[in-house]
């Protein structure tokens, strides 16, 4: 009896159930790709790219999101080889590679010769989760940002993005697109902030949301208010909202060198479960 050869293929709407079953092996860690699959139903016009699948013995064993972000999921050495081959054939279309540290490292090893040098390589990013009420009292000052406060929030979002990624989101005419993204987050109730006298002292967002997890991202504290131990209470407020809205787990990943942020998340009750890595272009 002949066995099906391992192969890479571009997935489509008919593969949604198989991808969902695969990701359910670790849905919290892979919340980003899970969210994208659920949101787009693997329709090419909504993906803005592709999702690749790798079959062994006729069974889907790994996937790789290949759009604005290149994100391997549950990959093996053979599937990494296949993903790298397709990525090299297409040329770089993504702004980053992200995922479990060992998977990203293996993929980047194969791509660096053609795609490098990267603008930034972040090889060790603790992936942390909170699956219980926060350990610190939530700040009453943090709330969802209103639609009429987008102008107030926007400068803080630009500052956070620039500080975190080393480049302004407004570069190369990107201001209108980034502003639209901020407005969309506000309209969906995913942007939180502590605002006083029309100034943002703290902000955070909830990014990918699935039935399994909600991901905390874009956390920022006004530099004038850092080092005062206030961030934990504000992060706790966002986490409380996420858990109250039905997410069983809140996740995040943070740069290893950002010791103050890691301590803040630990105070809130987050624990590390694995390591991520990110390659930025």
PLM-predicted stretches and their roles:
Residues 56-61, 65-140, 279:
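Acyl-donor-binding surface of acyltransferase catalytic domains
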Residues 77-86, 217-223, 227-244, 262-267:
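Conserved acetyl-CoA-binding loop-helix of GNAT-fold acetyltransferases
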Residues 98-104, 223, 252-262, 279-281:
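Conserved beta-strand-loop-alpha-helix junction that forms the acyl-donor binding cleft
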């Amino acid at each position: 009896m002949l066995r099906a050869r391992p192969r890479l293929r571009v997935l489509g709407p008919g593969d949604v159930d198989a991808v969902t079953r695969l990701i359910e092996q670790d849905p919290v860690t892979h919340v980003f790709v899970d969210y994208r699959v659920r949101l787009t139903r693997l329709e090419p016009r909504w993906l803005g790219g592709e999702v690749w699948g790798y079959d062994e013995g006729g069974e889907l064993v790994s996937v790789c999101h290949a759009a604005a972000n290149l994100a391997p999921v549950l990959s093996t050495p053979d599937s990494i080889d296949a993903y790298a081959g397709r990525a090299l054939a297409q040329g770089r279309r993504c702004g980053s590679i992200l995922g479990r540290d060992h998977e990203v490292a293996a993929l980047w090893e194969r791509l660096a010769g053609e795609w490098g040098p990267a603008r930034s390589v972040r090889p060790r990013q603790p992936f942390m989760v909170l699956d219980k009420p926060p350990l610190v009292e939530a700040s009453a000052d943090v709330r969802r940002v209103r639609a009429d406060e987008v102008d107030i929030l926007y400068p803080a979002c630009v500052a956070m993005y620039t500080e975190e990624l080393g480049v302004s989101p407004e570069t190369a005419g990107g201001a209108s697109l980034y502003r639209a993204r901020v407005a969309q987050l506000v309209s969906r109730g995913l942007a939180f902030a502590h605002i006083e006298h029309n100034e943002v002292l703290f902000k955070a967002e909830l990014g990918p949301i699935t039935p399994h997890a909600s991901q905390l991202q874009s956390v920022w504290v006004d530099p004038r208010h850092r080092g005062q131990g206030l961030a934990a209470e504000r992060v706790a407020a966002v986490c409380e909202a996420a858990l109250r809205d039905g997410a069983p787990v809140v996740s995040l990943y943070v740069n290893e060198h950002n010791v103050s942020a890691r301590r803040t998340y630990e105070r809130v009750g987050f624990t590390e479960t694995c390591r991520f890595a990110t390659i930025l272009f």
